[in-house]
């Protein structure tokens, strides 16, 4: 093995590739924000003159720059591509990717082959960003520029919402795939289906290879890939066709020559380039000599003007044959069409219509073809479908509708926006909360319910949240409805038992307070029951804790739930409950998936470690599994998990994948069983350091404090009202634990 030196260029993970990547648990810290840790972007956005900003963007569209000339004298196509590629990395299954943070400005995205020359689009927007400063984030500006591009070419958009705060460093939590090199594709199973943890066909592409799957120009196979990939972005067939047909009504691709003429991508470019990459050595390297994908296609006769029939008419009217363009890439040319496509730089030159393999896929796939023909015959329906799909594409990762900012928010509410009913009742007071807790405590003492069950259901309700797209969570009590109620990890029978118990409590409370119009929502009651159970478990361990409670959650209704997008909120892996969904081939290890889940829950390493150890001793494993339950005092909030994990008498051996036996070194007696998630806290030296702190003779209070910090955080991740008022921040800073004896 090579020696590690702090002065060496290799990172720890380059020396030891299997080292857990814990940095993803403390990304983009407030200290990185030059405006300060308490910068209020919503407050700044409210000062913005949106009309003037849009007027400035309209001027950008038609003021062609010599250093990067605009095709057809209009940057609209380029700005649509920038907005699309910024938002289009969104994956519905974990909420990562997308336009948030303005992450397309950073590696790896700015260096992807699919994003060649988008660095120039960002640079063209800099004068506007400079003018408005902190009032508009890059993330919002990029999406707004896409909208203005469409509007300036005659298309009526559906609306715009701000609220995307900028990041100040790359997001390294997203698993983009297993490949080492760009444009490789090692992410399909034996059936040709993409692995569950990725959403694009190739490393470095946002969707599919425009030449065809793995470079094979087969439109039928391309249609399969398109359907699979767009579905992972929560788009149905009609939305998919609307987006492709609408987006490809503008602009062109660029393949004046092979991509071998391109210089290094922005992160690898020389310092004198000042952040710009892909400097081309082919002729002028710009304008008519531009190389981006290496494909040279102009779809319509009106590349800088909206015409709802242009792309669809070109696609469906003519017969296309395969060719290789000047860039050496596969593309399709209309063999029976006249030269009707204008050249972007030579007014005396015309071209035949051309298409990508992925465009022809819409023609050969029978379902897509039918939608195309419907849209061609009903242009107004197509315009509306494209407008709505574009809004969804560019706003899916912004979070629930409650987080939208600005005056252009559409009035119509779509189910995918996760709307919630308004609170139409009086919330419980402090004395009511005390009374409800007493009732729950009494039921636990009488054996009507258990600490384990109440904690498990509260966690199940809250832990669907993803900080990535701010969806999921306890508000709405969606766990009472399908598809949430039937998620395997929620243990439906266990869930039903707890819900019946809590529904009786709610019924009695609402009835007693009918005159005052006071009610307790199931969403609030589920969390309150979990809090109460943890307080009981702490008392059993010898400590008194009081978990602050903030009523204000509301119960949703079935009609508010979009079942198509809701299914993506199912946690198919949750190390906190020692759960991996059966019959899924995961690329990453269980312990890597734990870190992934912890990041989605916005947890720090100390909070994650404490929560795993605490939930184990509270007997909160999926299917009541004994693995990792290192205690003889279950349902007591002790540090037993850490004490027993670090027992020097234990020797662990693998029995089968993800199952280990811990036996006494002295006697050979089987003491415990564990999964990889359990054992990682004794194996990874950073997590072991945390475990040692919690296992120490004076470590139990420290453990409980960090457990409570993690618990309170997870239970309130979707309480955006509390985050705005910074109430939770103050609570987490002032957790008090008192010894009972």
Spans of model-derived segments:
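Long, well-ordered alpha/beta core segments of mature domains
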Residues: 1-741
